[in-house]
């Protein structure tokens, strides 16, 4: 009873609920982002394939380094049924576009704007980027916080 009004307790309770919501075994929360063409794309549009969901930004050097691994995975496994949805939090749209071109990121791209960014980051409990999830064809989260060789190995095993 005493904890019910305690701010620290409520923050921890909310964080635990968020982490449970986006843990492996849970359905990936659906959201929309704006595409390079100015349309909207939803995570639900990618059902039917395995998806690497990659939250990043052009100014984030660890994100840019990770995109090299994601590109290798995409090139190796896209034909087998793997897709990538990279979702940027960039404020500078030109920097976002340039990074995509410079890094050869030919897969699905989206950018979050304003309140939608805050909403999606809260939905997924994102406190830092890169933040990566792997989602199965039914929309269920099957991997989280995998990067580099661990992400490559995990995704390769999906098609063994």
What are these regions, as identified by a protein language model?
Residues 1-41:
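Oxidative protein folding and maturation machinery
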Residues 47-48, 55-72:
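Conserved redox-active cysteine motifs that mediate thiol-disulfide chemistry
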Residues 47-49, 79, 105, 126:
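Active-site acidic short loop of glycosyltransferases
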Residues 50-51, 130:
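Alpha/beta-hydrolase fold active-site loops
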Residues 53, 85-87, 110, 133:
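Conserved hydrophobic packing residues within short motifs/helices of P-loop NTPase cores
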Residues 103-105, 112-158:
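Thiol/disulfide oxidoreductase modules built on the thioredoxin-like
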